[in-house]
Structures are given as structure tokens and as C-alpha cells.
From Swiss-Prot:
Protein name, entry field: Small ribosomal subunit protein uS9
Keywords recorded for this protein, A-Z: Ribonucleoprotein, Ribosomal protein
Gene behind the chain: rpsI
PANTHER family: RIBOSOMAL PROTEIN S9 (PTHR21569), SMALL RIBOSOMAL SUBUNIT PROTEIN US9M (PTHR21569:SF1)
Keyword Isomerase on entry: no
PROSITE patterns: RIBOSOMAL_S9 (PS00360)
SUPFAM superfamilies noted in UniProt: Ribosomal protein S5 domain 2-like
NCBIfam families: PRK00132.1
Keyword presence, tRNA processing: no
Length: 130
């Protein structure tokens, strides 16, 4: 018999993560690499595990992630968003706790575009009055 699989898509900045949850031991695989190998920063790995901590499901599911775009922080946020959405399929009762923790909300903040005549989005050359 086929094993239950739960899917979720997460987004953050320019990163898009497609997440699959399979009942297992808590192993997280990102782009066919172990999460410790793929994301070197321990604080970002804690971000990824937040949905499991909120729902008290640590070590209950193996996570398989395909993530593209963005950097480490954006990808970690996208993975967190995808895991939270997949956990909703596992048990709809998780919605209240995940929503209260702010894990189901897509973070709409994006990089501000560079404007012509400026060095960056807001950085201008020094203003001289006279």
C-alpha cells in the first residue's frame, strides 16, 4: 500500500519551495542533500523546524524539498511556509496554532527596485545645499 504523502508550496522573497511530508523519522532533505549540508547556518535550520515545534510533530515526518531561487534566508523561509501548508493537510486542527505563530502567512516583503539616478534603491549621492 502506498505511503501517505502531504504536499505544500511555500514562497519567500524570490524563493519557491515545493515540500513533501512523508511519515518517518524527521530527516529533512533539500535538493537531494541533507539539510545540514545544504543550509550551513544553524539559525536558519531552526527557522525550517518551527512548524514542527509549533504543532509538536518533531521527528514524525521526513521532509523532501525542492527549492529554487533566492538565498539561504529566502529559501529557509519558503521551506518553513511549505512545511506549514503541508502540515495543514496532515491535520486541519493545526491551522489555529500555525496561524497564531504566523507560519501560514506569505511574507509579502520583496526587494525594493533600484531607481534611476540613485546608487541603490534609496541611496543617493550626498546632497550639497550650496
Amino acid at each position: 500500500m502506498a505511503q501517505a504523502q502531504y504536499a505544500g508550496t511555500g514562497r519567500r522573497k524570490n524563493a519557491v519551495a515545493r515540500v513533501r511530508l512523508v511519515p518517518g523519522t524527521g530527516k529533512i532533505t533539500v535538493n537531494k542533500k541533507d539539510v545540514e549540508e545544504y543550509i550551513p547556518h544553524a539559525d536558519l535550520r531552526l527557522v525550517i523546524n518551527q512548524p514542527f515545534a509549533v504543532t509538536s510533530t518533531e521527528g514524525s515526518y521526513d521532509v523532501f524539498v525542492n527549492v529554487v531561487g533566492g538565498g539561504y534566508a529566502g529559501q529557509s523561509g519558503a521551506i518553513r511556509h511549505g512545511i506549514a501548508r503541508a502540515l495543514l493537510q496532515v491535520d486541519p486542527d493545526f491551522r489555529d496554532s500555525l496561524k497564531r505563530a504566523g507560519l501560514l502567512t506569505r511574507d509579502a516583503r520583496m526587494v525594493e527596485r533600484k531607481k534611476p539616478g540613485l546608487k541603490k534603491a534609496r541611496k543617493a549621492s550626498q546632497f550639497s545645499k550650496r
